[in-house]
Amino acid sequence: MSQRSVLITGCSSGIGYDAAHSLFKAGWRVFATCRKAEDVDRLTNEGLEALQLDVTDETSMDSALSEILSRTGGSLDALINNAAYATPGAAEDIPTEALREIFETNLFGLHALTRKVIPVMRKQGYGRIVNIGSVLGYVVFKWRAAYVATKYALEGYTDTLRLEMKDTPIKIILINPGPITSRIRQNSVPHFEKHINWSASPRAEQYRKSLLKRLYEDRGPDRYQLPASAVTKKLFVALDAKNPAPKMYVTTPAYTMNILRRVLPTRALDWLIQKG
């Protein structure tokens, strides 16, 4: 059996980083991609086959995919769309430009790369596309409007793509993690500082008491937080199972909220989320 190949986006840390190393150790030919050249160099020094890929840049995507296909002889078994970031802030304080920027990475870039990979998989007669969603793709929390909007959109996009791909040999899977050990909070700070003029907001006092503490103080792990390896375990199922579940959930909050959103009235769910 020939070595299976997988392209993973967003491998500099967190879920993508753990998945790249774990799949490599399991015998996959992993193409670990990052936006920054220094991260590519770091992963290369760690023994991974790393490439630079910016999902907001068509030329970057074309170049990386072309290089990958040249190395594999034109085949690619799997794509894991993981690259994403957050821009925290109250919805009324988020400039439209900030919303456009986050959609470019979290959805539009994912869509563009997926479109480039589907013809390869259709031609070879097999393939798996795994999108990394979030518990915030089906429930909401304050201060997360921009990220929530992209993940809700990804949920609908993935559902539609899955139905459309039913008549092809390409399987589409969505993994929705809850709180996972990663650098998403730290990585969100530059986006917050770039776009959110919190001190001029009518919610300035709420920012001081809540969001600023979350962003700038190390408050330790969330109560139900799991390591990135918990997501990787689901990725192995998504890639190896003959008929994997179309949606998978990671962490207790992800499972629980998926049930509660279906059974609770909106006001009751709002109350529960606010209380939590």
Label for each model-derived stretch:
Residues 53-63, 96-97:
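The beta1-alpha1 cofactor-binding region of Rossmann-like NAD(H)/NADP(H)-dependent oxidoreductases
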